[in-house]
Every structure is written in C-alpha cells, then in structure tokens.
Amino acid sequence: MINTNKEELLIGLVSDTHVPTRTDKVPEVILKDFKDKNVDYVFHMGDFTSIDIYEQFIETFGKDKVFAVIGNMDAGSSELKDILPESLEFDLYGHKIFITHGTGGPSMIVRRLNKSHDLSKYDIIIFGHVHRPYNEVWRDGKLYLNPGTPTDKRFTDINSYGYLRISKDKVEPEIIHL
C-alpha cells in the first residue's frame, strides 16, 4: 500500500493512454517528467488497452509505486481483467480518495459517478474515461479530478496528464497540457 511516512507525497496521474489503439507509445515527456519530479506514486485511471503498457509503468516506476484501475477499453484483455480492480480507495493523511475509470460521455460525469458509486465518505474522486482534464471542487465539497488523456483527441482538443501533491494540510492538484 501507500507509505505516508513522508511529510507529503507527489502522485503522477495519467489515464486513457490507449496504446496501441490510438498511438504507438506513451508520450516520453510524461514518463520523463514523472521521473524528473521523482513522483512517489503513479495512479493510472484505466484504458491502457494493452498489458504491455501496464507492464511498462511497472518496469519504469516499480510494482509497489503503480496503482491502476481497469477501464472500459481494457475489458478485452483477460490479463488486465485478472489484475486490475474496478476501483481503489486510499486514506492519505486523512484525505479519503476514490479512484475509478468512469462511464458514459463527458457531460454529467460527476452525477454518473455519484449514481454508480457511494462517494459520500470520500474527499477526492479521481477518474478517467471522458478524456477531458477536470479539476473542480463540486458543490458537495469534494474534489473531482481527471488528468485527461495524453494520446486521444476524442471528446477533447487538449492532451494532458497531472499531479496530486498531498499532505495533512494540503491537496494540490495540477493538470499539465501537452
């Protein structure tokens, strides 16, 4: 699990890499940026579309540092279905975090997430699927965060990934546009 012995953590966020269906590889700039910033962990919100890409993240950052969920486009991979859960939850420095892929189109994604999951006990909801970066505290007081997609222009004209810097007193999300 996640070690919170440090004062704060820097978590790299990526989703919907869609390799090889949309592109031939994860953009090197993301892997380099995560390494250069010495991320503590990487969260991937699904749609690898290939076990090879999941394994690339494991090889690059280490099995104990990569946490991922299955996406709708991963369902065809029995290997990914066998190892990736539909959701993850963490308590980091007292902040309760829920991670899932998501379903449906971009409009009303927050409502759909709340209908398909009981999010009442979480402070931060991190999701993928809609390809659009999303960083918003909603009227329920929860942070909804989506790093977008680094490779696919469906539903968006911006490719992106992100970071979450978190400590007892701080929650700082950041979206990076490519």
Regions found by a protein language model. Name each.
Residues 63-107:
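Helix-adjacent hinge/juxtasegments
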Residues 53-57, 112-115:
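A short acidic, amphipathic alpha-helical/loop segment
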Residues 13-15, 41-47, 66-72, 99-101, ...:
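Active-site neighborhood of phospho(di)ester-bond hydrolases with catalytic His/Asp-centered motifs
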Residues 1-56, 77-83, 157-159:
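N-terminal active-site segment of His-dependent metallophosphoesterases
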